[in-house]
Amino acid sequence: MAILATTNQSKKSIEIIPAGSYAARCYSMIEIGTIKETFNGESKERKKVRITWELPTEMITFNEERGEQPRVIAKEFTLSLHEKSTLRGFLESWRGKSFTDKEAQSFDVTNLIGVPCMLSITHKTATNGNTYANISSVSMLPKGMDCPELINERQELTYDNFKQELFESLPDFIKEKVVMSKEYQSLNKDTNEVPF
C-alpha cells in the first residue's frame, strides 16, 4: 500500500477576480500588529494592517449552504501615514483629498469600514506560475455611481478591543501573522499555546 503525497487538490479552485474596475465597499480591518519582515536581505519591524473590501456586484457561491456572497479582495499595508507611505497615498486617493498635518498625526482607519470606493484590479503572475488578483489603485466612486450596501458582516480586529471569536474565524494564514506580532504576544504573554 502506498502513501501518496500530492498537491492540495481537495481545495476547490475559485476563479480569480477578473482584471478591471469595481465598485467596492470596505468591510474588514484587521490589525495584524508589529511583525518582522525581510526585504532585500534587510530585516525590519513594521506595524501592519489588512484591509478587505467586498465587491457587491460580483457575487459567487463559495458554499452551497450560504448561497451567493460577494467576492472579496484585501491589501496589507504598513500602518503609517508618513508622507511617503503607501497607506497614506492609498487613503488620500480613496478619500479624494490630502491629509492635513493634524489628520495625519492620528487617523483611525477603522472609520473607513463601510465606505465605498472604486478599486482597480490587475493580475500578476508569481514566480511559481500562479496568477493573483491585486489592487493596483483606489479612488472615490465616480459621481452618480452607486455601490450596494454592505453585505458581509463588519469586521474590526484591534488590540485595544481584541475579539477572540473574530480572531478564530479568520483564515489560518492571517492568524499565523497575527500570533507572530509583538502585540499579540504581549496580549497572550501568560500562555504559550497556539490558538488554532
Question: What do these predicted regions represent?
Answer:
Residues 1-196:
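Short beta-rich binding modules
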